[in-house]
Amino acid sequence: MNQHLRFATLSKYPPYRSGHAKQALWNNTALAVLTGVEQRQVTYCGVSSDPEDDAGARVQVHHVTEVRGNRRVPDGHLLRAVAAKLYRVVLENDVDVINTYYIDPHAAIANRVADALALVGRRPIVINSIEGSDVLESVCEHLTDGSAAPLFGDVMRGDVLCTVSHYTAQRFLAGAEAIGGARLADTIAESIVLRYPGLPSAAYAQPGDADLREFRHKHGLRQDSILISTLGRLEEEKGLDTLLAIADIAAATRPELEFVIAGTGSLGDRLVEQAQQVPNLTVLRNVSTHDAQCLRAATEVGVFPTKIIPGFIETFCVAALEYEALGVPVLASAIGGVPEATPDDRFLVEPGTSAAEWLARIEEVLANRAGRGAVATAYAGKFTSARSAQRLIDLATLAADRLDRQSPLKLDPLDEYLTTWPARLPLVTGTAEPAPM
């Protein structure tokens, strides 16, 4: 196969407007360095004019800007427009690999485009990746109504089937068993490969002391306080009510602590209002990339009390990994794929833990801050975008070299790519878990 592989990554949002689309950009930037050629990203939910949204010189972003309807066909226009854009991008730029973020609906689009390109002798490798909402919103919560079933056919038509975490693979296989029994689950299990997210080199760059002082001054934070923070979407599933309660308790017992909740989301207005009643809590909305990095670096403990709600469970936790990359220990809920983003159980808190117990855990981390920080740094160092991109190159090359491309690539069972805590067990199927209530 061509040594200078060209990828076209299909993501819903532009690379600067969602976590997974940003991860796609990180991978594409690393792919450009590793291959020496420009990489491409196809997206269909908006174009931004924010200067921080620039994808960089090595990644070309192609936006679906026009969706033409057909009065005789009432639905499906957007998916057809995305497929048409992806087809043109692949054909006109000699793309070798289509890589998807989320299988729903991207696997079907990628397969459709690959089949069409095969008619003109240009079929690319298709790498389908199972991500967050694929697990619950597309599969586990739609087993009984039947809408999950076609997704299993979609993923098995690709050349490579990736999951963002071992937990994601297990839940997906449980859904497969519920629909098609152990035989279907075992067939898919043979083809699932892990490809963890990877952070760009900028994520490991420590801001200077002057930058940290300016950051604190700019946002009204005390220069001598001990910062406890979280950064991510301001949504119900992030468990931010727990952090509010922790800050409220600490206001009376640990005056040296200051708490920061940062990010964007639908709870922003409510959180700002609630923070007015908690003197040691600051809510920062729409922070810049620079300020986000300063917040992480200035923090003593990152806190992620994420929880399960209908339609959502963390299938990894890149936000925690970004803190760890700067040597900041974290405490995160032990749910879903979160344990795979943390070094060991000292960094995890069981679901249902009270705010007072969370605060006690924070105090325990502070008492061992240097050691925990060193562990966090070493662990996060495994998760680079270069390593994730190299994984894509290796998988695409192996898939292209097969004589039989009628089913997805099957890796050697001894594949030891990025084995993490907890110890990675063979992908065995079990009873499908009920949807969370």
Q: Where do the PLM segments sit?
A:
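Short hydrophobic beta-strand element within catalytic cores of glycosyltransferases
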Residues: 322-332
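Conserved donor-binding/catalytic core segment of Leloir-type glycosyltransferases
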Residues: 8, 162, 211, 216, ...
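N-terminal subdomain of nucleotide-sugar transferases
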Residues: 1-49, 418-437
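Nucleotide-sugar donor phosphate/pyrophosphate-binding loop at the beta->alpha transition
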Residues: 121-128, 133-157, 176-180
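Acidic donor-binding loop of glycosyltransferase active sites
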Residues: 297-312, 328
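Nucleotide-activated donor-binding/catalytic signature segment of Leloir-type glycosyltransferases, i.e.
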Residues: 269-291
